[in-house]
A protein has these predicted regions:
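Solvent-exposed edge beta-strands and adjacent loop segments
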Residues: 2-77, 121-137
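Membrane-topology and secretion signals of cell-surface/extracellular proteins
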Residues: 26-28, 113-120, 151
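Compositionally biased, intrinsically disordered low-complexity segments
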Residues: 34-37, 93, 155-156
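Short, acidic/charged, Gly/Pro-enriched secondary-structure junctions
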Residues: 82-118
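Short, cysteine-centered beta-strand-loop-beta hairpins and adjacent loop/turn segments enriched
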Residues: 75-81, 149-153
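Mixed-charge, glycine-accented linear interaction segment located at domain edges/termini
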Residues: 119-157
Length: 157
C-alpha cells in the first residue's frame, strides 16, 4: 500500500509587493489580510484547423497571460490606524497609467513548496466591494501580468 497524501490548503499562497519598485534591489512587503487568492495562467488559443484534419478542429497556443485575482479585507493597525502597507502600495497604483500603474510582485507557497514561486510586474485593478451594514470592507484586486512571470526560488523554502 502506498503512503497517503496530504491535502494542501488554498490559503497556502502568500503575496508580496516591492515597495521600492526595483527589479535589482526589491524591498518586499507582505500583502496581509488576503481573504481569497487565485493565481492564473490563461492560454490564448488560435484555430489552426485545416483540410487535412478530416473534419476535426485544431488549435495552437500562441500566448500566455498570467494574473492574480484576490479579495483583500481592509484591516488597520490598532496602534496607528494605518492600513496594511502591502495593500496601500497596490492601491496607490490602481488609478495610475504606465509604469506608475503597475507593481512588482512575487507570490509563492508559504509552506515552502519549491515549484510554486514566481515574480513579475502587473497592472492593478482595485474594486471596493461595498455591501450591507454587517459586511466587512473588502476589495477585489486584479493583478494582470505585464510580460512574463519568472520562476524564483521560494523565499519560504
Amino acid at each position: 500500500m502506498s503512503q497517503p497524501l496530504t491535502s494542501e490548503l488554498a490559503r497556502r499562497w502568500r503575496l508580496d509587493v516591492d515597495t521600492a519598485d526595483s527589479a535589482s534591489s526589491p524591498t518586499w512587503v507582505q500583502v496581509r489580510a488576503i481573504g481569497e487568492m487565485t493565481p492564473k495562467v490563461t492560454p490564448k488559443m488560435q484555430d489552426d484547423t485545416d483540410y487535412d484534419s478530416d473534419g476535426y478542429g485544431s488549435s495552437t497556443k500562441t500566448l500566455l497571460n498570467w494574473s492574480i485575482e484576490a479579495t483583500l479585507i481592509t484591516k488597520t493597525s490598532p496602534v496607528t490606524g494605518a492600513v496594511d502597507a502591502g495593500q496601500a502600495k497596490i492601491k496607490a497604483a490602481h488609478d495610475k497609467f504606465g509604469e506608475e500603474g503597475q507593481v512588482h510582485i512575487r507570490w509563492y507557497d508559504r509552506n515552502g513548496l519549491p515549484d510554486d514561486a514566481y515574480e513579475g510586474w502587473a497592472q492593478v485593478s482595485w474594486e471596493p466591494s461595498g455591501g450591507k451594514a454587517d459586511a466587512l470592507d473588502e476589495v477585489k484586486v486584479s493583478l494582470d501580468g505585464n510580460g512574463a512571470r519568472t520562476a524564483i526560488i521560494n523565499p519560504a523554502a
